[in-house]
């Protein structure tokens, strides 16, 4: 018997199906940072909060006023796990104290210096900043996929960096030729 390797979803988008009722993930687009036999980690990239980079900087370095442009940089709700921890997706090329290069020419930075560099004008111009992440135990995401909770879409940096947050979910679905408004909210298996 031939052993089949599991199919992992690292570096793909997860599109929440319309029947997703979990408020943490309903109508979300999630970038999968890691997916292996031990579980998965992703960042929801289409849920901006009312919190801005200026608000975060006020907490991190209150002695310095945040530049006005920081009031325009939204902080996204990246998921329900460790909602006080920050993550920044940005194009590869700049390295910070805690930066991991990911496939497709993007990086994930988790140290405060990336936020300071963005605020001070020498950080990555293209970025998605989140607080929190989505986490799945071993086999959990695979089970959700089998239950038709998610669609997958290949990663596209334009969706991440060039499309407004509120349009990212539909943009990813369009890459698949799908209009989410036309999909039933009832889950099922054929």
UniProtKB/Swiss-Prot annotation:
Gene3D superfamilies xrefs: VC0467-like
Domain of life according to the entry: Bacteria
Pfam families for this protein: DUF179
GO CC aspect terms: cytosol
InterPro entries in alphabetical order: AlgH-like
Family: Belongs to the UPF0301 (AlgH) family.
Protein name: UPF0301 protein PSPTO_5037
Organism: Pseudomonas syringae pv. tomato (strain ATCC BAA-871 / DC3000)
Origin organism lineage: Bacteria, Pseudomonadati, Pseudomonadota, Gammaproteobacteria, Pseudomonadales
């Amino acid at each position: 018997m031939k052993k089949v390797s599991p199919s992992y979803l690292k570096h793909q988008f997860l599109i929440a199906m319309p029947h997703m009722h979990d408020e943490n993930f309903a109508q979300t687009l999630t970038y999968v940072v890691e997916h292996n036999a031990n579980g998965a980690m992703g960042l929801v990239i289409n849920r901006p909060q009312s919190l801005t980079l200026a608000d975060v900087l006020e907490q991190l370095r209150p002695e310095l006023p945040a530049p006005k442009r920081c009031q325009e940089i939204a902080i996204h709700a990246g998921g329900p796990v460790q909602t006080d921890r920050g993550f920044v997706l940005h194009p590869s090329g700049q390295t910070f104290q805690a930066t991991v290069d990911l496939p497709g020419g993007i990086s994930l930075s988790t140290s405060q210096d990336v936020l300071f560099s963005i605020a001070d004008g020498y950080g990555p111009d293209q970025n998605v900043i989140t607080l929190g992440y989505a986490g799945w135990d071993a086999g959990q995401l695979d089970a959700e996929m089998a239950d038709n909770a998610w669609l997958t879409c290949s990663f596209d940096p334009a969706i991440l960096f060039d499309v407004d947050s509120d349009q990212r979910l539909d943009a990813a679905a369009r890459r698949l030729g799908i209009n989410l408004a036309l999909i039933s909210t009832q889950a099922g298996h054929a």
